[in-house]
Amino acid sequence: MVDAVYRSDSRRVLATLIRLLGDFDLAEEALHDAFTAAVERWPRDGIPANPRAWLVSTGRFKAIDAMRRRVRFDASLQEIARRWDADASDPAAWDEESVEDDRLRLIFTCCHPALPPDAQVALTLREVCGLTTEEIARAFLTGPPTVAQRIVRAKAKIRNAGIPYEVPSRADLPNRVDTVLHVVYLVFNEGYSASSGVSVTRHDLSGEAIRLGRLLGELLPEPEVAGLLALMLLQESRRAARTSPAGELVLLGDQDRSLWNRELIAEGSALVQRALSSRRFGPYTLQAAIAAVHAEAPAAGATDWAQIVGLYDVLARADPSPVVELNRAAAVAMRDGPLAGLTLIDAILARGDLADYHLAHSARADLCRRLGRAAEARAAYARALRLTRQEPERRFLERRLSELPD
């Protein structure tokens, strides 16, 4: 039972303890002490009527007791001890609305723009999702000491810079929500299409990102929050078909669509419709709408490429970037033929954009291959190979290279 409560409520308890104690490390210590007490007492005394409230209360009072002991040796801690004692009897600290808002406070604090992006991701996975330092390091192919240092520095920055533990004001909320969504999507993207390593995907990361997306949807019912969750669900729906049994990369057009998860597609498509109907949607919703068009096509040949190009046109105006241009060019190639797409990709590369982006060169190689321009295709595949760090992608590109005529 304690294990079940830990899985379901430990992050909520931690979020409230951070608010009450004002420090990440003290809150984590209090959380550990509270669950240690639960393991000792619940089998003997029975499970409390409200386990979460019991854990928060126990953790807080253990922290207060520890602080009182420290005051004997460090007088500078007396003010903190007095404040904690006074707050302990404040009913506003315990009302349900405050406790529910604590999860939002934690997310916004972990994703504060004053923190470096890699620290935002590491802190969010550690504090909001509860992953260990070793799990985060393994997911991002980084050493545990590196991840630990990022987390330590992020906590120090929050403490020393006086970053408030709060939900942003209404005026600041749109920009801050964008930062949170960006962090969640970074986590998902690394799980959906790993930037390096032996696997195409990392289910642990994409699963955590979807869990975060669902949590945000509960706490912050905004159209773009729904749009991001829809995008993640629709992309995740194809996971089983994205690699062969041998672990080889399978392109979208060659995937066995019977392996796609129809429940995730239905949920994602419904979220897209809800976000679009709000008229307040943004880039994540538009990307999700594109993913929904792919998901709803019964076969690759039945894909509505005209609709996809139209959606990319809207996305390019809402959130212009070279990557959006590249994806639009690939869709134009499917609608109007490879030469039309190649012309657009060459224009992007001629500007100097995406010169070190392996997918730009692999897309160019594929269009040259389809046009029978083997020498250009070979050079572009070779360039893409030099830039990719993911083993299945490397094997795919090597296979395509070997299939080109001499």
Q: Where are the predicted features?
A:
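Amphipathic, Lys/Arg- and hydrophobic-enriched alpha-helical face
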Residues: 6-24, 37-41, 108, 112, ...
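"A position-specific structural signal for the A-helix of alpha-solenoid helical repeats
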Residues: 228, 232-235, 287, 291, ...
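Arg/Lys-rich amphipathic alpha helix in sigma70-family domain 2
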Residues: 60-78
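A short, charge-rich alpha-helical start-of-domain segment used by transcription regulators
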Residues: 1-15, 25, 174-182, 186
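Conserved RNAP core-binding helix
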Residues: 24-43, 49-56, 78, 129, ...
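Amphipathic alpha-helical interface segments
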Residues: 15-16, 20, 30-41, 54-66, ...
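Amphipathic helix-loop-helix modules that constitute alpha-helical solenoid scaffolds
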Residues: 70, 78-118, 127-135, 142-313
